Amino acid sequence: EMCIRDSYTPLEAKVLDMALILHMEHGGGNNSTFTTHVVTSSGTDTYSAIAAALASLKGPKHGGANVKVFYMFEDIKKHIKDWKDDEEIADYLEKILEKQTFDRMGLIYGMGHAVYTISDPRQIILKGAVQKLAKAEGYDEDFELYERVERLAPQVIGKKRKIYKGVASNVDFYSLSLIHI
């Protein structure tokens, strides 16, 4: 279950700020950035413009995908006995793709992006910060599970689906893991 607290360590605050910036500061064509441009053009204050962008980001077709990643990992943790067993993890990822488990949508959330097919630069930055946070907070095993899924998912997807451009983890993959940590 997601935990929201009243106070955060300096490292937690820094990583959370980084996650928000990486989600918001991303070119001019995505939904939340476009929303910011439209709302700002009305002459409103900065806080209102950022609030509008965050409201847009919350939508499931934009940044809300990170919530799906979070719940997918909660499901994986419940069903995978050995978090270090690549074969068991890959088999479960296949079941997700085949709509046999989790939300039965056939998607491994946090994988793939329309533009970033080799790697998502935002994800690379966020992953490093989340790794430091996981180590500091004693969530090394959780982080290792994320890394295993990140490594195995493209192989499983490539085996089950036709992938023309490649598939890599995106910024949503690690963004809500920090809330759990």
Spans of model-derived segments:
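Non-transmembrane, aqueous-exposed alpha-helical and coiled segments at domain scale
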Residues: 1, 5-179
